[in-house]
C-alpha cells in the first residue's frame, strides 16, 4: 500500500503544488502546499473533496489509478473554497452519474462557482446524517465558519477516521517531508485563527467521537499522538499563548532609527530575563510569521515611526491583521518615533483598544529621530512593566 494511503479502503489521491508562491495570494509557502483528497472504496465509492485546478491533472491521474475503471458514486463536498472545490466541474463532467453530497449551505453556494441546476444530482445532509457506502459509513458534522459558512467534516466509523476539512491543516507539500508542527501554527492563526469560538464548538463535537486518524485537506495525515494536535487546537482556539513569558517585538523602520531602538529594546528585555524575544522586522519579514508569533507569545512590543501624520504602513497593515484575526488576551507596550507631531502611538493605541482583553503598559515612549541615551530609562521602564 502507498505510504500516503490511509488504509486499504481509504486511498490518498491528492497532489502537491510546489510551484505556488503565495497561498491565498498573500502567504509565502516556500515549501509549497498539498491539496488533499481521499477516495473511499467500498460497495459505493466516495471521493472526499477535490483539489485546486492547478493540481487537477495529477489528481485525476491518481484517482483513475485507484478507481481502476470504476466510477465514483459520490463526491462529498466538505468545503467550497477553490483550493478544494476548484475541480468539481471536471468531476461532474467526467462522471455524469455521480452524486454530490453536501449541506444546504453547500448547495446554495455551489452555483456561484459552477453555474447550473445541480439539484437532480445533489444529496443534502444535515448534522448527524449518515451515508452508508457498504462496510463504511460517513456521519456528517457541521462546522460553520471553520472557516467558511458551508464547512462540514465527516466521520467514518468503521476505521475511526475524521475527515477534518481545513481543520488540522498546514502549509508545505507532502514531498517536503516537513512535520505538522513546522507550519501548523502559521497556517492556523492566519487561515482559521479568527474563528476560535467556532473551532471550540467543533472540538466539543469531536470529543464525542472515537478518532484514530485525522485526514485534513492540507498537510500530512495524522495517525499518532492525536492528543498533541487536538491539544494545540484547543489552546489556540481559546487564544491562550503557548509561551506566556515570551515577547513579540514587532517594529517598522524607515531609515533605521526605529530599528536601532528595537535592537536596544530587545537587549533590555533579554537582560531583564525574558526567555525569548521574537524579533520581527515588519518591513522585510513575512507578516504571517509575525501574526503567528503574536499569538504564540503572551506579550508584545510595537515600535513604529509616524508617517504622513499617522502610522507607518507596515505596522498599520500588521495591526489591522491582528485586529481582523481577533488577537486578544495579551499584554502590550508601545514605542513611537516622530521628529515632529508624533502620531504613531495614538493610532496603535486605537487598534489595541478595539481588541478584547489587551492590557496596555501605562508608559508609552516617544523617540525623536535617532535613539539617544535619554531614551534608555523609558525603555527600561516599559520593559519592567511588560514583564511584571
Predicted features along the sequence, with ranges:
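Conserved beta-strand hairpin/beta-sheet module of binuclear metal-dependent hydrolase folds
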Residues: 3-64, 153-156, 160-164, 258
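Metallo-beta-lactamase
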Residues: 4-8, 102-151, 195-203
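Active-site-proximal loop/helix segment associated with metal-binding centers of metalloenzymes
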Residues: 147, 151, 167-194, 237-242
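FMN-binding flavodoxin-like domain, especially the glycine-rich phosphate-binding loop
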Residues: 174-214, 218-221, 264-280, 290-388
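Short N-terminal or domain-adjacent regulatory/targeting segments
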Residues: 215-243, 317
Amino acid at each position: 500500500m502507498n505510504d500516503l494511503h490511509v488504509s486499504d479502503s481509504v486511498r490518498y489521491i491528492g497532489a502537491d503544488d510546489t510551484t505556488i508562491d503565495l497561498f491565498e495570494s498573500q502567504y509565502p509557502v516556500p515549501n509549497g502546499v498539498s491539496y488533499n483528497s481521499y477516495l473511499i472504496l467500498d460497495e459505493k465509492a466516495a471521493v472526499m473533496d477535490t483539489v485546486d485546478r492547478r493540481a487537477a491533472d495529477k489528481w485525476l491521474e491518481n484517482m483513475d489509478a485507484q478507481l481502476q475503471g470504476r466510477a465514483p458514486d459520490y463526491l462529498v463536498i466538505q468545503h467550497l473554497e477553490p483550493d478544494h472545490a476548484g475541480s468539481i466541474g471536471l468531476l461532474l463532467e467526467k462522471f455524469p452519474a455521480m452524486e454530490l453530497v453536501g449541506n444546504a449551505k453547500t448547495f446554495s453556494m455551489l452555483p456561484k462557482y459552477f453555474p447550473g441546476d445541480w439539484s437532480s444530482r445533489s444529496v443534502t445532509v444535515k448534522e448527524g446524517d449518515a451515508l452508508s457506502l457498504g462496510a463504511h459509513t460517513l456521519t456528517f458534522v457541521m462546522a460553520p465558519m471553520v472557516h467558511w459558512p458551508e464547512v462540514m467534516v465527516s466521520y467514518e466509523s468503521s476505521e475511526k477516521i475524521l475527515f477534518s476539512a481545513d481543520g488540522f491543516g498546514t502549509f508545505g507539500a507532502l514531498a517536503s517531508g516537513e512535520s505538522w508542527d513546522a507550519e501548523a501554527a502559521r497556517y492556523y492563526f492566519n487561515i482559521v485563527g479568527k474563528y476560535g469560538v467556532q473551532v471550540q464548538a467543533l472540538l466539543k463535537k469531536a470529543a464525542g467521537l472515537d478518532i484514530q486518524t485525522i485526514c485534513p485537506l492540507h498537510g500530512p495525515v495524522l495517525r499518532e499522538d492525536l492528543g498533541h494536535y487536538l491539544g494545540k487546537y484547543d489552546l489556540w482556539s481559546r487564544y491562550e499563548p503557548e509561551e506566556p513569558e515570551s515577547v513579540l517585538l514587532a517594529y517598522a523602520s524607515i531609515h533605521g532609527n526605529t530599528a536601532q531602538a528595537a535592537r536596544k529594546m530587545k537587549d533590555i528585555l533579554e537582560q531583564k530575563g525574558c526567555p525569548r524575544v521574537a524579533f520581527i522586522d515588519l518591513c522585510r519579514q513575512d507578516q504571517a510569521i509575525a501574526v503567528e508569533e503574536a499569538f504564540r507569545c503572551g506579550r508584545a512590543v510595537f515600535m513604529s515611526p509616524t508617517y504622513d501624520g499617522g502610522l507607518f504602513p507596515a505596522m498599520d497593515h500588521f495591526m489591522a491583521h491582528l485586529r481582523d484575526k481577533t488577537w486578544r488576551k495579551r499584554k502590550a507596550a508601545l514605542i513611537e518615533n516622530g521628529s515632529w507631531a508624533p502620531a504613531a502611538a495614538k493610532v496603535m493605541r486605537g487598534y489595541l483598544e478595539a481588541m478584547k482583553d489587551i492590557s496596555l503598559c501605562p508608559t508609552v515612549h516617544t523617540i525623536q529621530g535617532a535613539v539617544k541615551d535619554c531614551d534608555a530609562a523609558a525603555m527600561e521602564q516599559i520593559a519592567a512593566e511588560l514583564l511584571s
